[in-house]
Amino acid sequence: LGLWALTATHAANDFYTGAVAALLPFFVLHAQYSYAAVAGITLAATALSSVAQPMFGFLSDRFGMRWMSLAGLLAAGAGIALSGIVADSYAAVWAVVAISGIGVAAYHPAATMEARELGGGTSGSMSLFSVGGNVGVALAPSAVILVVGLFGLSGSALLIIPAVVLGAVYAVVSRRHLFSRAAPVERAAAAPKASIPDDWRAFTWLTAVLATWSVAYVGTSTFISLYSIQKFDVGAGFASIALSVFPAAGAVGTLTGGWLSDRLGRLRVVRAGYLLAAAATVAIAFAPTPAAVIAATAALGTGLFLPFAAQITLSHSYLPNRIGMASGVTLGLTLSLGGLVSPLLGSIADRASIQSVFMIVAALLMAGFALSFVLKERRPGSPQIPEPQIQATELDRIHE
């Protein structure tokens, strides 16, 4: 039950990441923001979190603060709830969305450590927790269209409901240990610290690969709806279908990738995912119809998330003594890097076209594919790498 509650909060937390992207077309249509301006809102959701995420990871490693996931969830919800209310002021929107981004950043390290504690560290079990996030992102566009369609941008206030309701459920289920200190990095079940060194070089290469993933994810989330509107002159409601399909396909990719990683090897899955994602991005750029955009977006979501769980577990194997920091970088900092690039992508979209943005994304994914060949597998049983302590039967426990 604890893992189900935690997974539900992951869905709620990442719902607010999806809500940012879903709100962008309405800021363009109702508040007359430029593409560069809405890309700046994406930056707001990620800029401060790019600094805060490793700090939250360090705090999780050092102090095991379980309550930080709940506090982060509530902050994420509050920021998005306020964003539509203050839409007349770009600075105010930027500020409240930044608060939401910090909340999302605070959630991930603590929640990932708890999920690992509950369900172990295999790619398969990790993928299940990650799917909670995919589900939340997928539900966000429909929820945003519903509340904004009925009440205008001020209807964003209703978007705080998932954080309050699911946060309350989690607090009740986890009340006995919510404010207790988690065992940092679960070293009790591992080998002595001296025998499990951190491999910072490998982790740096993984971070470089993830940076290309981040730009692809944020770029697609920011521009896929706007692309359909610009190229095919469809309404915001129809355009949002692709935005829902993207994370829904990502959920399929996450589960499939986790299963394949445990059977075929993580690096094979990582490389296959980047290659598929690059091809799908080119298909989006040259799609002849809105339906073709949706189909290509589904392929992109699947390919982009095939490596997701593998990348998380690789980060844990590279930094076995700093699980919180590894999670913070894998799930947060790399995503934030995409947000930092988003204003540049928005400027390109204003000056050229959104099609140009997707061609750039395709090139970056090919760069990620090439960089993935530098990565090394750290297999359980190595004298330097402890086997993750996993309870494989717990399939429901456990991002981006």
PLM features per residue range, with description:
Residues 18, 46-54, 138, 247-255, ...:
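Residue-level signature of mid-helix packing/kink "hotspots" within the transmembrane helices
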Residues 20-21, 202-251:
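Extracytoplasmic gate region of multi-pass secondary transporters
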Residues 52-64, 253-265, 349-350:
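Helix-to-loop junctions at the C-terminal end of transmembrane segments
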Residues 66-69, 270:
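Primarily marks hydrophobic transmembrane alpha-helices of the MFS/SLC 12-helix fold
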Residues 74-88, 276-288:
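C-terminal ends and interior cores of transmembrane alpha-helices
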Residues 96-132:
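Cytoplasmic helix-loop-helix junction between adjacent transmembrane helices
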Residues 129-176:
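Helix-loop-helix hairpin linking two adjacent transmembrane segments in secondary transporters
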Residues 261-311:
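C-terminal transmembrane helical hairpin of 12-TM major facilitator-type secondary transporters
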